[in-house]
Each structure stands twice: as structure tokens, then as C-alpha cells.
Amino acid sequence: MNFKIETTPRFEKDVKKLCKRFPKLKEDLIQLITELKNDPTMGTHLGNNIYKIRLQNSSISSGKSGGFRIISYYFVGDTLYLVTMYSKSDRETILDNELKKIIQQEINER
């Protein structure tokens, strides 16, 4: 499969903030990107080409359930966008209407 993985400004801001608290996050993300190159639709399908990916936090021993959530948007064609990221210890979930608004701001208005 030949496609690009791009990050949104919001995702980059989220990662920068989380890296201050979780020093192994960059290593975890490198591993995830390698996996995404083989399967861009990995994770839980939320509809409309939006996926929620569970990522284990290697900085703490909590497994995937207490790790990170990454929202990705697979633009049919050749681009996978990493839209936003949050820690389960900070936020339980993200609402559908909030997610649609974020995707519109971060991707559709480019």
C-alpha cells in the first residue's frame, strides 16, 4: 500500500504536551506508525473513515486500557491523518460531535 501518514497541528500539540509527562511516548509512536504503514485502518472504526487507536503507554505499566487514544482519519486515496491524541488518565472519551468539529477544523479546512 502506498500512502502518506500526516499529522495535524492539534496532534503535534497533543504529543508535545504528553511527551513532557511520558518520556517513552515518542518510541511508542514510532512503533505505531510502523504498524499503521501495514494497516492504515487499524483500531476501532467509528464511522466516516475515522478510527480510534489504543496505544499502550510504555512509561507506566497500565496496559492499553490506561494508555493513549489516537484518533485517525483515513482519507480514501493516499493519506492517513493523525488528528488528535489523549491519555486515558486525563480524559475518558471524546464525543462524536466534538470529533467531527476537530476533523473539520484540522483537515477539511486545509
Placement of each model-derived feature along the sequence:
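Arg/Lys-rich, positively charged N-terminal/basic patches that mediate binding to nucleic acids
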Residues: M1-Q31
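Residues in soluble alpha-helical coiled-coils and helical-bundle/repeat scaffolds
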Residues: K20-P23, K37, T41, D90
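Basic/aromatic recognition patch in beta-strand/loop cores that engages polyanionic ligands
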Residues: T41-M85
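Enriched for short, Lys/Arg-rich terminal
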Residues: F68-R110
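Short, structured surface patches at the beginning of a domain
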Residues: K24, D28, T44-L46, Q56-I60, ...
